[in-house]
Amino acid sequence: MAVNAKNWQELKKPNALEKKASGNGKCKATFVAEPLERGFGLTLGNALRRVLLSSLQGAAITAIKIENVLHEFSSLNGVREDVTDIVLNIKQVAIKMQGDGSRRLHISRTGPGVVTAGDIAVSGDIEVMNPELVICHLDQGAVFNAELTVDTGKGYVAAVANRPADAPIGLIPVDALYSPVRQVAYKVENARVGQELDYDKLLLTIETDGTISPEDAIAYSARILQDQLQLFVHFDDGLAPPTSAIGQSSLPSSSSEAENSANQLNRNLLKKVDELELSVRSANCLKNDNIIYIGDLVQKTEAEMLRTPNFGRKSLNEIKEVLSGMGLRLGMEIPGWPPENIEEMAKKLEQEY
């Protein structure tokens, strides 16, 4: 099949993704992408918004069991809120959990005082992101003991689906909002390219619950779309050809052109990042992050690079431009990297040049 690369190469693409912090910079940010072809602002904005709200993984409380409470329409002596209000408050607890599977957390407080999310006893791989959240108020002598069930998932799961078949008496299932993204809004404005205004500018505002940064949220959503759309591409566009292992092409050996392209790709991976002629700032950031070979670099995602100390968008764009000139990009998957004899292979490559 003759591939007409002009179908995508001649479309206007954003030069960079600009971030504008708004409100709480850790949880809320606006991203600006321009210029885009007319109509692409709406297409990308709507697709990203839907994925952000529905498909990102997170953790949430799925059930609660309170001592001396049989059902959610009960009340507790010395507790100002009834159980229904307590459950509503607990649903707002933002939990960050590293592992998978269901966990049990506990709260134990004696009045007088305020029970907050910070009173939840957590293990090392679990963190409560909004410890100041008020759960209930206790009067003098009141006792509040509760067990919380935490699980991981995506999207929204109704309380009825969180009730196990062997649920004990007193277990109250809770609506679980696993999504770490709380709000997404986008708008499309006109963008100027030269004297032309017939282009789109996409402004995407993302607010999270603090368990994930807005940058990571948009990166994950874009990766999900990329993964879903890959099925529809039935041809090789001539960019970095896939490799089954370092030094081995997964394309048919009958094509000498494909073999040469794959060999050149693998040669580039074995080069050291010092050979990229980057700015001093970018080079130092890579050195401090222990990135030695180009093969190490291309496996990093943009989000991972931006988490590197002193590494900003300017350095990111510089590296992306250099890698693009070599037919490489960030976020590549390279099976078998690093090879066991990487130093020997790199030394042999240097001798050839």
UniProtKB/Swiss-Prot annotation:
Membrane-crossing segments per the record: none
Gene3D superfamilies per UniProt: 5' to 3' exonuclease, C-terminal subdomain, DNA-directed RNA polymerase, insert domain, RNA polymerase, RBP11-like subunit
Stored InterPro entries: DNA-dir_RNA_pol_insert, DNA-dir_RNA_pol_RpoA/D/Rpb3, DNA-dir_RpoA, RBP11-like, RNAP_asu_C, RNApol_insert_sf
GO molecular function: DNA binding; DNA-directed RNA polymerase activity; protein dimerization activity
Composition-biased stretches (Low complexity): 248-263
Region: Disordered, residue numbers: 244-263
EC number: 2.7.7.6
Domain of life: Bacteria
Residue ranges of coiled coil: none
Record-stated family: Belongs to the RNA polymerase alpha chain family.
UniProt domain comment: The N-terminal domain is essential for RNAP assembly and basal transcription, whereas the C-terminal domain is involved in interaction with transcriptional regulators and with upstream promoter elements.
Protein name: DNA-directed RNA polymerase subunit alpha
